[in-house]
Amino acid sequence: MTNSNRIKLTWISFLSYALTGALVIVTGMVMGNIADYFNLPVSSMSNTFTFLNAGILISIFLNAWLMEIVPLKTQLRFGFLLMVLAVAGLMFSHSLALFSTAMFILGVVSGITMSIGTFLITQMYEGRQRGSRLLFTDSFFSMAGMIFPMIAAFLLAHSIEWYWVYACIGLVYVAIFILTFGCEFPALGKHAPKTDAPVEKEKWGIGVLFLSVAALCYILGQLGFISWVPEYAKGLGMSLNDAGTLVSNFWMSYMVGMWAFSFILRFFDLQRILTVLAGLAAILMYVFNTGTPAHMAWSILALGFFSSAIYTTIITLGSQQTKVPSPKLVNFVLTCGTIGTMLTFVVTGPIVEHSGPQAALLTANGLYAVVFVMCFLLGFVSRHRQHNTLTSH
């Protein structure tokens, strides 16, 4: 693979995460305007965004098999066509059914693109470099999550219709589409070059189960925590502005942590540092949940920084459980994480209703403790060390 080709594929991976980050995180900014547009209460409008999450979940799950049937370049180019249709549907339709369909299509496109982006990084880089590259790729999710809400705020403040926010997000996919030209993608399944060597049936091992449970519990814990921090902070007498600042500080610290750990991870065994970070995150979340408002700002900054590398390291370790990176395995771990996203309000909503926001935060804390236990148990069964040794010879 030429260096320029590798750079193009790496940028496609970066932008695939930016696309998903923009679509998921911008929801809160535009929901009120979309509710007004359809003359609906915000509470019932929020349910239609489940179509976006469902599209992401289904496409990540199915793409484990689709990757071996449909070439990656074809998928990305077809995704561009779907993106244009979805944004056009948002712009020219006043039907709630068509809006929900367009949201589902956006979810499908983003899920397919993100799973391809993740697979490309696991295919092109090995060992500890894979972990640091995946972490840097994941930082584009947070970066888009900071940039696009600002773009949305600017457009909405200037009385520009909400659907132009999605047109701006579509420009990210235009860049991905342009990068596919003159770019060679790894061939998979029936398109892969034929070899005389017998195909080994891949055995995943129990380590994949531990990592999948950790991925689900981590995302469910993280989103369950950050979704209810504002309500919890307001209950302690903080202003809405200060409560919002806590969330902003978390994501800012999270992004800085990703950049820092993309360098730091190269010097450590991934399973050991993952166990340490998961333990630290559980402790820091407990400090936040039981501390005074005066200490909240510092504990949430520390939590954002030290938890930033956990999810990506889980995916990296998953990809290292087999000799050759398996798209099915990587997508399985990603799917478990996405299920965590889908379950966020299903799990935390009733808890808040019965016991208040702090109960939801303590539940999230318990989920982080489960992540620590899974990472610790992984140390006894993980195959990443033997596969790293094989690839380094």
Curated annotation (Swiss-Prot):
Keywords: Cell inner membrane, Cell membrane, Membrane, Transmembrane, Transmembrane helix. It is a multi-pass membrane protein. It comes from the Bacteria. SUPFAM superfamilies: MFS general substrate transporter. Signal peptide: none annotated. One of its GO terms (cellular component) is plasma membrane. Pfam families: MFS_1. The chain crosses the membrane at residues 11-31, 51-71, 78-98, 101-121, 140-160, 162-182, 206-226, 245-265, 273-293, 297-317, 332-352, 361-381. It is found in: Cell inner membrane. GO terms for molecular function: transmembrane transporter activity. The keyword Ion transport does not apply. The keyword DNA damage does not apply. PANTHER family: L-FUCOSE-PROTON SYMPORTER, PROTEIN TSGA. Belongs to the major facilitator superfamily. TsgA family. NCBIfam families: PRK03699.1. This is Protein TsgA. It comes from Shigella boydii serotype 18 (strain CDC 3083-94 / BS512). The gene is tsgA.
